Amino acid sequence: MPQYVPPPTPQYALESGPVLLKDGRTATLRPATPEDRPKLIEFLARLSPQARAFRFFSEIKPETAADLLLRQHPGEDKVALLVLTGDQQRAELTDQQRAEGTTPERIIASGEYVQEGPGSTSAEVAFLVEDSYQGRGLGSLLLERLALIGVRRGIRRFHAFTLAENRQMLEVFKASGYTLHSHRESGEVEVSFDIEPTADTLARFELRERVATVASLEPLFHPRGVAVVGASRDPASVGYRVLENLVLNRFQGPVYPVNPAAAETPGEVPVVGSMLAYASVEDVPWPVDLAIITTSKDSVLGAAESCGRRGVRAVMVLTTDLEAEQIRALTALCNGYGMRLVGPGSLGVIVNYPEVQLCAGLSSALPPKGRIALSSQSGAVGLAVVEYARETGLGLSSFVSLGAKVDISSNDLIQYWEEDEATGLILLYLESFGNPRRFARLARRVGRKKPLLVVRPGRDPVVETLFKQTGVVRAENLEEMFDIAALMAYQPLPEGPKVALLTNAYGPAMLAAEAL
């Protein structure tokens, strides 16, 4: 009997939510609806004749193809998924449309499975990716999600028909980890495979997820240029402090102050902190990978919109007290433009690599360089840990204050630090779990390479069990976390099981022996 392998756990629902492409860009996955027909027609019209022929085996009108994709078969199970992005169309909005909250998105990929008949456990699967987005992992993503949904709904086997020259689709199936059975006849290839999760398919899922996550966080940890939106001439303002901390701690790349008021004063050179200022991120003529938003809460969405139009890859929002609707709009806006989001309510990011010195936030100075990475949901706790590290000489490789963690979470950071050569120990201050199953899967895997040390307020038997099962080391408080971190960071592991106790008192020796 084959060994049961639990299915992988995406960050969001299988059928809908943000997804990451292989190049780190974000997009939106959701089920297709009849209302999507106009967008489907536009999508199909943009495809090359070859792409349409590969999917439908002949030249076909976009309108007819859209109707085929949306057609429901009575009594049969059909799942049709779309991947959408607004990274190009949002930039074409008018000011009035932006004020009205218009968020046009275009379809860049579609995938579906259709049950062979009522009660059947087999289904035909197919997917289609826009030419300019091919090679970014969308085919693998759609196959992965369709298979997970199919298993949940009683489907056990997929089969697909494709032209023999459609090497890209065949490669997607080969790279999936499923055991394939193929038959070729008259220039067509039929591929069939069981879709129950296996150790190999789980490993492929985790690899795809890890590659996409790491790529998406590169602009945060290795930005080519940083813009401070809301940079001010007032030394007491947050924008001034952030700009000052970036410059005084010698970030190697360019820093761009953005402040409409400073840039539009008649008769004055537009400067903030002796640096040329810009009225908008869109006016910066050089690449901006990371934008730090420090504006008032009513200006955050407009600032993020400008970042999206400029092609910024990562946004960190220090502004607090956003309303729930503003947070939802901010999250959707960043996802639509393909930007990763830290915050809102973050207190900053520190990168302390040999090649990057980034002190982007309210921490006034970099801690010593070291191999400890830290993530904190509490900004105050995070800054206290950074300050303690600086006072005691405890070296940090990086630090992220997550804030509201509506996008980037500790799960994302764990995957980045897993691949980070500068990091050997991961510290987490957790107040809540966004996705406990996913955290458990990641902690178990990453913990085999690098220790995970966690501080979490309160006691919960379920959480305690999760930590024990995944090998996570829990510290009772911050003081204990510092002690354990120093031990793990600087004390090498024993080479063998032989341990000697040296003491000047019998009692402590007995206690130490029992602990061993």
Model-derived regions: residue spans:
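Long, contiguous binding/interaction regions
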Residues: 2-219
